[in-house]
A protein has these predicted regions:
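A glycine-rich, hydrophobic/aromatic-adjacent loop/helix-cap motif
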Residues: 1-188
Length: 188
């Protein structure tokens, strides 16, 4: 029986944040990303939201032995859903593919009490840069809603548990894209 795969569209695109080695760039149709928060976490995070006619880049990776326990724990604020729409990838052996998304009735827009963490944005952008180059980073920003939410600048003392060290050019790229989308970056 083939291993199932997950479709990651945020921090899971950054291979440095997980150990799922059998991974491939992928695109899924019918979805966008949005910044949301729930009562399950003190800060905002990305979720996938249905969006007819839209497509987002991401990463699919095998879940060996159908063992979802560690990934479900990491993604505890999300529900796991089967991917039923068009999915494009080069994985020769992908079984069923699942996507994590927050149920709309359990989420709300980010606010000052539930900001987006810059250290989280850094991780996601680093992943997209490594998988898709600068064009992929631009597509990430363009296919994600909620950049008007407060972004807490925690870069010097990262709060995000899977934060990564960014090179100076990666930081400049993140900062330039945040300016381009008129993001609201606030001091920590």
């Amino acid at each position: 029986m083939k291993d199932p795969f997950f479709f990651g569209y945020g921090s899971l695109v950054n291979r440095a944040t997980h150990s799922y080695a059998h991974a491939f760039p992928a695109q899924i149709s019918g979805w966008r990303r949005a910044w949301r928060h729930t009562t399950l976490r003190p800060v905002a995070f990305l979720t996938a939201v249905p969006a007819h006619g839209e497509q987002i880049d991401g990463l699919i990776a095998a879940v060996p032995g159908h063992d979802w326990a560690a990934l479900d724990e990491r993604e505890h604020a999300y529900d796991r859903h089967p991917v039923t729409g068009p999915l494009h990838h080069q994985a020769p052996d992908a079984g069923d593919v699942q996507i994590y998304a927050v149920a709309p009735q359990h989420s709300d827009s980010p606010d000052a009490r539930h900001p987006i963490l810059l250290s989280y944005v850094d991780v996601v952008v680093q992943g997209y840069l490594r998988e898709y180059g600068e064009a992929g980073v631009i597509r990430f920003f363009d296919t994600t809603d909620g950049w008007d939410a407060p972004i807490k600048d925690d870069r010097s003392a990262p709060i995000y548990p899977r934060h990564q060290t960014l090179h100076a050019d990666e930081k400049r790229l993140v900062d330039a894209q945040l300016v381009r989308v008129s993001a609201n970056v606030v001091a920590a």
